[in-house]
């Protein structure tokens, strides 16, 4: 049984706690927030036995094996270091950190401490993603030539202040674009060789629209993310003999396979569910088997993504 503690008592942590409850070999036993009242309220609502008004007290709990970090992006680096120094395995929300240097530092420390560390890129673990990857491996669309993905919605800067605050790690790339950036190369098992991008910025300075072109080893990927306009949240993988469509790419349950005549010849749908379950199951499996990183979501993926996002966000 793997016992989890949660740092950050927000909505996404609630989804994580629900996912853990669906597993027989994991349990959330504590939550910490900078506000003791918030932690107490959250723990009562989620039926969590222990709560703390600071992170250090949670990390001092000897029963906790692993920590799920659900704080804002700007806090991730320090939170991860604190957890690893306390001897806890770590699952941290995306984006894991904000630079390649930070990514290298936390990944190296995790290995030095013999601890598991993973970015919570849950889309990689969804059954529809696994299905699409298998179709590609089987050659059902032929050689992949192009991948495209868009993800965007019109965010309210007043209601969604965090998304537009550079001090909190806001911006569309950290919040939305990270999904296709880390999932599309995974589908074809290829490294990103080159990149160019265009960035539009909000008055606060964060990116609110990004368009990227990625040169992979044998194909090209285009992706766009935005807080300024609603976009179809779909991904397409185009091969020489057909294509795959992933509706609602980062959270949906469906994959569709089309031939060159634009006919749907196969499909998969896992149904509506809490998609975090597959990610958490992988974390538990890795910890129980002594793995320091997941083969599905390895450290190098996080390091590469951190390097690219940093390069994009420094464009003017």
Task: Enumerate the language-model features and the residues they cover.
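Active-site loop of classical SDR/Rossmann-like NAD(P)-dependent oxidoreductases
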Residues: 268-281, 297
């Amino acid at each position: 049984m793997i016992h989890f503690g949660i740092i950050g008592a927000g909505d996404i942590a609630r989804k994580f706690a629900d996912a853990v409850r669906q597993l027989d070999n994991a349990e959330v036993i504590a939550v910490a927030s900078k506000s003791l009242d918030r932690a107490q309220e959250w723990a009562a609502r989620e039926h969590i036995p222990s709560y703390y008004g600071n992170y250090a007290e949670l990390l001092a709990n000897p029963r906790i094996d692993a920590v799920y970090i659900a704080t804002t992006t700007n806090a991730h680096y320090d939170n991860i270091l604190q957890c690893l120094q306390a001897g806890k395995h770590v699952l941290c929300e995306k984006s894991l950190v904000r630079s390649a240097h930070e990514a290298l530092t936390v990944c190296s420390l995790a290995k030095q401490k013999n601890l598991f560390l993973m970015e919570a890129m849950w889309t990689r673990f969804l059954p529809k993603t696994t299905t699409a990857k298998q179709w590609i491996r089987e050659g059902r669309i032929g050689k992949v030539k192009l991948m495209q993905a868009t993800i965007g919605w019109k965010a309210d800067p007043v209601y969604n202040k965090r998304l537009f605050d550079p001090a909190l790690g806001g911006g569309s790339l950290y919040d939305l674009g990270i999904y296709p950036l880390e999932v599309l190369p995974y589908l074809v098992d290829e490294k990103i060789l080159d990149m160019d991008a265009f960035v539009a910025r909000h008055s606060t300075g964060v990116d609110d629209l990004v368009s990227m072109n990625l040169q992979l080893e044998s194909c090209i990927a285009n992706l766009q993310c935005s807080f300024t306009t609603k976009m179809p949240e779909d991904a397409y993988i185009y091969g020489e003999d057909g294509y795959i469509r992933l509706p609602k790419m980062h959270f949906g349950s469906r994959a569709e396979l089309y031939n060159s005549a634009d006919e749907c010849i196969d499909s998969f749908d896992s149904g509506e569910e809490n998609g975090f379950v597959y990610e958490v199951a992988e974390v538990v499996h890795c910890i129980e088997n002594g793995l320091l990183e997941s083969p599905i979501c390895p450290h190098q993926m996080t390091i590469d993504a951190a390097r690219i996002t940093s390069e994009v966000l420094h464009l003017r």
